[in-house]
């Protein structure tokens, strides 16, 4: 981990603490575009990322959900024949089903959602469903790290950090 990157020592310490935690962790990373947020997460958690999803710029809710399900189907074939979820609550229920099939262990598993603010368009229901996924499922396990990343700093601070 540390040997792959130069700099970002404080950030690497925070990510290491999450790996060593005895509970699930939610990490929000935000900042201007093109400063290496995604690189930091992908490089540091290279082997631990189990599910990764990047929001679509100006994407409609239906396209965001379709993209989410396509990414989920890249890591499991369990949902290939299923119809596309109607909303984010249903989409996150598929992610729960996927993780319920992975035995809980001391080894951390990372869920990475990049460009998080792009997914939460007006009336999309994404943030509500994400909060439900985190509170209702992730916090009941001790082996998950959920990393959300975004360039819209004001959104990330207002909706995630605070």
Model region roles, listed by residue range:
Residues 1-162:
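Phosphate-binding site recognition
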């Amino acid at each position: 981990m540390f040997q792959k990157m130069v700099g970002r020592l404080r950030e690497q310490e925070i990510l290491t603490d999450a790996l060593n935690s005895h509970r699930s962790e939610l990490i929000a990373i935000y900042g201007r575009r093109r400063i290496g947020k995604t690189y930091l997460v992908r490089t540091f958690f290279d082997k631990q990322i189990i599910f990764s999803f990047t929001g679509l710029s100006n994407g409609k809710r239906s396209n965001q959900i379709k993209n989410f399900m396509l990414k989920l189907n890249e890591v499991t074939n369990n949902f290939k024949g299923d119809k596309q979820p109607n909303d984010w609550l249903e989409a996150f229920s598929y992610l729960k089903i996927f993780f319920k099939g992975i035995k809980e262990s001391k080894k951390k598993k990372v869920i990475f959602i990049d460009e998080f603010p792009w997914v939460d368009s007006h009336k999309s229901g994404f943030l509500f469903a994400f909060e439900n996924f985190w509170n209702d499922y992730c916090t009941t396990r001790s082996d998950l790290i959920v990393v959300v990343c975004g360039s819209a700093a004001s959104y990330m601070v207002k909706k995630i950090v605070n």
